[in-house]
Amino acid sequence: MTLPLPVDLSGRSLLRVGDLVPAEVEAILDLAGELKHDLTPRLAGRTLGLVFMQPSTRTRLSFSAAMAQLGGMPISLRSDELQLSRGESIGDTARVLSRYVDVAAIRTLSHDDLETWAEAATIPVINALTQAEHPCQALADALTIRDRLGGLDGVRIGWVGDGTNVLVSLAGLAALTGMRVVAACPSGYEPPPGTPVELVRDPREAADRADVLVTDIWTSLGTDEEAAQRLRDLEPYRVDGALLATAAPGAVVLHCLPAHPGEEITAEVLYGPRSAVWDEAENRLHVQKALLALLLG
């Protein structure tokens, strides 16, 4: 039997965490937990279009598996397989895509381009990562924290390193769910103004008594030319055993992956007993199943 949907998100897009209200976040996480075990083909006959302007491992695989587990069909396309690469506009591509599929997940560095996709499309559009935000990752992080710690309200998150799009989305979600984020970022690597974090410079301040310790890759999408300088600037912000020891007893470690062990995180921590990284990666699948089910009603 198909489970009733807890909120009505039918027909909506998800471009930023701020598109959601607290009750909707809770409903997505609750449904994601249920869909870990319920494989009812509720989206049989529906189609997901995946458009990736940048490489992807987890996002492409998890969205494809999510749609398949719900009984639907995923179709994945790279930018070089589309007429976009030969000058067709995003708007026209979105209008055509809307005639063939029921929902689209788009990965593109430019958030403005994502908004153009959503404005032209007549189907729900999901942000599968832009330089501005990564809302699906934030939802997976929240599900992982809730699974590990039993709840979200009052949880202290320590972020260490570059103030990336992942931090922006995680901080936005924390503000909706009663969590607090303390972010240690070097000068020049802060998140955008208005991001709801307590900003510090010393990584030990972020890690101190944190229930969750989070980091991200130092050389992310669009930053390869700056790699050498970034490695020098971020060297003091590595998550290692000594830093983890200052966190709360039972604290867990998150990383959205891919990871570079020895740079932003040591292998000891990444593969250690307090790492929830692999559960976090799996939970991308489950929160995206919930999103697809809710957006398609």
Regions found by a protein language model. Give the residues of each.
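Adenosine-phosphate binding glycine-rich loop
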Residues: 250-251, 256-297
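Phosphate/diphosphate ligand-binding glycine-rich loop within oxidoreductases
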Residues: 35, 43-146, 261
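Phosphate-coordination loops involved in phosphoryl transfer and adenosine-cofactor binding
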Residues: 42-48, 153-155, 250
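Positively charged, low-complexity intrinsically disordered leader regions
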Residues: 1-61, 65
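Rossmann-like adenosine-cofactor binding region
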Residues: 194-268
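Short, structured coil segments at secondary-structure junctions
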Residues: 70, 120-122, 177, 195-196, ...
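Glycine-rich phosphate/diphosphate-binding loop of Rossmann-like nucleotide-binding domains
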Residues: 53-65, 147-216
